[in-house]
Curated annotation (Swiss-Prot):
GO biological process, one term: mitochondrial electron transport, ubiquinol to cytochrome c
Manner of cofactor binding, per the entry note: Binds 2 heme b groups non-covalently.
Cofactor list: heme b
Cellular component terms (Gene Ontology): mitochondrial inner membrane; respiratory chain complex III
Role of this protein: Component of the ubiquinol-cytochrome c reductase complex (complex III or cytochrome b-c1 complex) that is part of the mitochondrial respiratory chain. The b-c1 complex mediates electron transfer from ubiquinol to cytochrome c. Contributes to the generation of a proton gradient across the mitochondrial membrane that is then used for ATP synthesis.
Residue stretches spanning the membrane: 33-53, 77-98, 113-133, 178-198, 226-246, 288-308, 320-340, 347-367
Native source species: Tragelaphus eurycerus (Bongo)
Mode of membrane association: Multi-pass membrane protein
Name the UniProt record assigns to this protein: Cytochrome b
Annotated heme b b562 binding sites: 83, 182
């Protein structure tokens, strides 16, 4: 008799995706981040669901409802901090996952890559709206500053901002709609992640060499299930260390002050995972130019397949490209640091140079280096 996991209509889908899936025999720990992102998403949806049971999306009670969750709800504090720090873990895994795709040339799977970029935008939008919900000072002013950027769009900008706000400033209508969107988007992300996986399984996984692994596949279970469990344990360990020992390490102290439209915080800045994009935005003195640079800093990922001129898919055997990749990683860390600093003399020029470097490396230096490496192959 045929095994039920291979015959049952539902079990068959799970089996083909997670059990009998043929996987390359040489994929490294950099391939763990896909499953870790899945775990992060499930964790965020569950903790978010329990938080939504006690949260009220009204400007007068939002801040106190979060306080109530932390003080009066059974284990509310741990749920709240798991959700807040879970977002940080989510973005760490996201950036590692994207970096892996860039390093090993996974962007040549066009559909998978493009849906991945859409996923990145959706997760960023969700995280931004989630940051507004506690209605602290940084929530309010962060929402005001970021939504205001849309006013840079010619002709329709001002109307668009007022339409998003639901009034003439960030207020009750804004908070209510942000809560609604923050609740629905993770389910859209789940659907997109399934499509992402569907397209990936059409081609099969890439591997560190970038060479086809069709002649050397192994079943996903038990080899990669056990490997993913190790990754998951490390993820949960890191998350719980953050939650239990330093829950506010990655947050902003200003968000423990209730939102006050009459009092602007000295330094308005988003969560740490958006600081690199915020630094790029601030490095351009023109408002519209800054907004375009901000969007392009992420949208540039769509161009990765077009900018790939190398004869080799992966960077594994391309030392010059490897150097450039790690310079890019260091540049992103520099931008993250600059994004959290005040707008004053050495930080302004450092931010501008780091922003120029970011676009220069991706758009010019990487393709040129690839061409030089192609020449090495001829000799």
């Amino acid at each position: 008799m045929i095994n039920i996991r291979k015959s049952h209509p539902l079990m068959k889908i799970v089996n083909n995706a997670f059990i009998d899936l043929p996987a390359p025999s040489n994929i490294s720990s950099w391939w763990n981040f896909g499953s870790l992102l899945g775990i992060c998403l499930i964790l965020q949806i569950l903790t978010g669901l329990f938080l939504a049971m006690h949260y009220t999306s009204d400007t007068t009670t939002a801040f106190s409802s979060v306080t109530h969750i932390c003080r009066d709800v059974n284990y509310g504090w741990i749920i709240r901090y798991m959700h807040a720090n879970g977002a940080s873990m989510f973005f760490i895994c996201l950036y590692m996952h994207v970096g892996r795709g860039m390093y090993y040339g996974s962007y040549t799977f066009l559909e998978t890559w493009n849906i991945g970029v859409i996923l990145l935008f959706t997760v960023m939008a969700t995280a931004f709206m989630g940051y507004v919900l506690p209605w602290g000072q940084m929530s309010f002013w962060g929402a005001t500053v970021i939504t205001n950027l849309l006013s840079a769009i010619p002709y329709i900008g001002t109307s668009l901002v007022e339409w998003i706000w639901g009034g003439f400033s960030v207020d009750k209508a804004t908070l209510t709609r942000f809560f609604a969107f923050h609740f629905i988007l993770p389910f859209i992300i789940t659907a997109l992640a399934m499509v992402h996986l569907l397209f990936l399984h059409e081609t099969g996984s890439n591997n560190p060499t970038g060479i086809s692994s069709n002649m050397d596949k192994i079943p996903f279970h038990p080899y990669y299930t056990i490997k993913d469990i190790l990754g998951a344990l490390l993820l949960i360990l890191t998350l719980m260390l953050l939650v239990l020992f330093a829950p506010d390490l990655l947050g902003d102290p200003d968000n423990y002050t209730p939102a006050n439209p009459l009092n602007t915080p000295p330094h308005i800045k988003p969560e740490w995972y958006f600081l690199f994009a915020y630094a790029i935005l601030r490095s351009i003195p023109n408002k519209l130019g800054g907004v375009l640079a901000l969007v392009l800093s992420i949208l540039i990922l769509i161009l990765m397949p077009l900018l790939h001129v190398s004869k080799q898919r992966s960077m594994m055997f391309r030392p010059l490209s490897q150097c450039l990749f790690w310079i890019l990683a260091a540049d992103l860390l520099t931008l993250t640091w600059i994004g959290g600093q005040p707008v004053e003399h050495p930080y302004i020029i450092i931010g501008q140079l780091a922003s120029i470097m970011y676009f220069l490396i991706i758009l010019v230096l990487m393709p040129v280096t690839s061409m030089i490496e192609n020449n090495f192959l001829k000799r």
